[in-house]
Amino acid sequence: MRKNRATKREILPDPVYNSRLVTKAINAIMLEGKKGLAQQIVYQSFDLIKKKTNEDGIEVFKKALENIMPSLELRVRRVAGSNFQVPTVVSKERKQTLGLRWLILSARKRNEKSMIEKLAAEIIDASKGTGAAFKKKEDTHKMAEANKAFAHLRF
């Protein structure tokens, strides 16, 4: 076990939008260290969003992320030999991380041609309150509501 908790590294804002949130999205999309490619995907999907919706790409992205960030999550707790799914409140940092993760995973599963189109379509859907990422959040909240009885088993 480690002696102290690891310190959080500061994430630098991205060069185009000067936003830490966009940097987190780029880092989440990045595979095998190809950051330049990840940046292209994110920026071009923001441009595509602007073309399709006539709204600023980053504003639609922020709205989409706001719609899919969960306020509750389920954590498994073992009590007396039984596993219980305990609903817990999610911190701001984890909300953001889960929202980005769900957005990108559901974008990767879509059927559009390129990742740029997939990401843009998923962001637009999430901003409207539809799409796979939004459904994932709704399912998580329903499960948390169903397991409300175990909330007293907090961590």
UniProtKB/Swiss-Prot annotation:
Residue ranges the record marks as coiled coil: none
Any one GO molecular-function label of the UniProt entry: structural constituent of ribosome
InterPro entries referenced in this protein's UniProt entry, alphabetically: Ribosomal_uS7, Ribosomal_uS7_bac/org-type, Ribosomal_uS7_CS, Ribosomal_uS7_dom, Ribosomal_uS7_dom_sf
Gene Ontology terms: cellular component: small ribosomal subunit
Protein biosynthesis listed as a keyword: no
GO process annotations (BP): translation
Top-level taxonomic group: Bacteria
Keywords recorded for this protein, A-Z: Ribonucleoprotein, Ribosomal protein, RNA-binding, rRNA-binding, tRNA-binding
Record HAMAP family: Ribosomal_uS7_B
Sequence similarity: Belongs to the universal ribosomal protein uS7 family.
Record's subunit section: Part of the 30S ribosomal subunit. Contacts proteins S9 and S11.
Function description: One of the primary rRNA binding proteins, it binds directly to 16S rRNA where it nucleates assembly of the head domain of the 30S subunit. Is located at the subunit interface close to the decoding center, probably blocks exit of the E-site tRNA.
NCBIfam families, per the entry: rpsG_bact
Protein name as catalogued: Small ribosomal subunit protein uS7
Origin species: Malacoplasma penetrans (strain HF-2) (Mycoplasma penetrans)
Name of the gene this protein is made from: rpsG
